[in-house]
Amino acid sequence: TTPKVLWINSPGNPTGAVLPVEHLAKVVAWARRHGVVVAADECYAELDWRQPDPRRPGPRHTTPSLLDPAVCGGSHEGLLAVYSLSKQSNLAGYRAAFVAGDPALIAGLVEVRRHAGMMVPGPVQAAMTVALRDDEHVADQRLRYGVRREILIEALEGVGLRIEHSEAGLY
């Protein structure tokens, strides 16, 4: 049986592995051949650790999005990217998130949301708008998480544990 939806996480939970553009493009091509919607959890995309020192300024790696033209060929058909501001903007209690992608799929989600009473409060929408316009606080959060991550890695490796695939996210 062919699935209706393929859900992917990149950065992955719990490994922190990041799917490269080439792999994501293959997933999209396969899904389109089989009429499968691809939904991608990209909530930790701003917490990409694949640079020498996340505390230093300068160019950094970014987690590729399902909606990147190099991945989707410029068409969002059959694709949904799910994004939360919980970690990057420290808005976990706000339940601040959004879905982007295929306009037809988004319209269906909006209808369900409207009739199910799942409204995002106005103040939360305003906070999201401010947060999405400000990259500086995201860099600050990345720095905080990066420092904590290094302390944890050192402690875990100090007792003989091995860390694998931890490229991004909180993992």
Residues covered by each model-derived region:
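Active-site pre-lysine segment of PLP-dependent enzymes
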Residues: 1-2, 12-37, 42-91
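Active-site C-terminal subdomain of aminotransferase-like
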Residues: 74-75, 104-124
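Conserved glycine-rich beta-strand-loop-beta hairpin in the small C-terminal domain of fold type I
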Residues: 125, 129, 145-153, 163-171
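Hydrophobic residues in well-ordered beta-strands that form the structural core
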Residues: 7, 38-40, 120
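Short beta-strand-to-turn element immediately C-terminal to the catalytic PLP-Schiff-base lysine
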Residues: 96-103
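Structural signature of PLP-dependent enzymes
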Residues: 109-114, 131-154
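Structural motif of enzymes handling amino- and sulfur-group chemistry
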Residues: 103, 120-135, 140-141
